[in-house]
């Protein structure tokens, strides 16, 4: 009898162990009278994994033998949808809500087991949000192509970075002969940053980029919406501002772009010359021809040499235009030394001042605001004495200042611009206060003023003894001329200086 009891206890332990999962997943409660109430076993280990425009729900089923179905409910605010699945199902892909796409929303997902008598298990709730084109992680991916430049039948691409997770990318386009063109984009090609496509294209048709990616938390491969590139031209802000200085364009006309065969680059500094690729018929670039300073100053890299900050993209643009259009470059002095000189570069040497007719300022002197304090002479008369060795220099102060230099010509006179001569600095460190921008205003009565230039503030060169011509947008008639310059900062002092101001 003792052994029989031991065997019975062991058998009971084995049975209980075998039914362990069922006991965990089958819930019982007791009424006040001790009657047990049995609940349907509920699923466990539920996960909601985001996919591309869907949410994948997975779970582990209860071993409750009375389960006949599984119920999945998903809702967002007042919208709700559901599905009944056969017992034993362990996964479901939620792709729509009431027949409509899920959209970029986070859904409450409720899973229950349904018994053969229609009773439901206790609910388990998880939350899931699909990946869509509006998901912030999807939006964080760039379009791979930064800019497309179209030059006759050719296309130049500039690239952004190949981001982690991108699986594949390619371009489609229409070839010159009307057939469909295809170019695969690879990490190696994109790393080049700049690329002249081999195919000749029909550039009246769009170019489309296709991309796919795989995010670590997404069960699907992401298929981005195809992106079309049209014929819209894109300019960097500094290049566009320089064209506005020269020509007054708020928006650069397409017809004007198409007509340009020669461009003059005199900007003190450009980020890049890649914008030259926007000009399909460009065959000559003239660099630094409108800066005039003594030849002895040409080696001054800080004040006498215009610069380009990204020589790699700039060299690429010049080489492509030389290859496609036979572009030549005329470079004066030693401007843009960062560029790699090529066979199509022509070194032109020093510049010569243009011949202009100066208005006679004999007997006229500039007035300054703020005026000199009593006992101090800034030598305003030096601005019109015709001697570049003399100069005007206001009192040095602890505060930054703007100086208004105005002159009354006595009567209205026709004028096309002002000529400014920079001071020749003996102290190289003081050179940093030389004006690099100027505002010019004209008036007929000395009360109402207007800008005759395309820009309110025009950049000027600051080399030792440099002669700067500020051309007006047209010929104006005025009696009063005003120039506004700002002080520079030298150690603890603020001041500036000029040698000559003339009007032509």
Label the predicted regions.
Residues 15-18:
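C-terminal motif of bacterial Sec signal peptides marking the signal peptidase cleavage site
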Residues 21-154, 231-241, 245, 475:
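Acidic/polar, low-complexity intrinsically disordered N-terminal segments immediately downstream
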Residues 53-57, 153-157, 403-405, 414-416:
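Structural beta-strand segments of beta-rich domains
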Residues 61-81, 160-183, 434-436:
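Solvent-exposed loop/turn segments flanking beta-strands in beta-repeat/beta-sandwich domains
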Residues 97-124, 194-222:
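Beta-strand-rich modules
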Residues 235-242, 255, 344-412, 421-433, ...:
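Disordered, acidic Ser/Thr/Pro-rich linker "stalks" and the adjacent N-terminal cap
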Residues 258-272, 278-356:
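Concave beta-strand-loop units of leucine-rich repeat
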Residues 301-303, 400-401, 429-504:
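Trp- and acidic/polar-enriched beta-sheet ligand-binding modules for extracellular glycan
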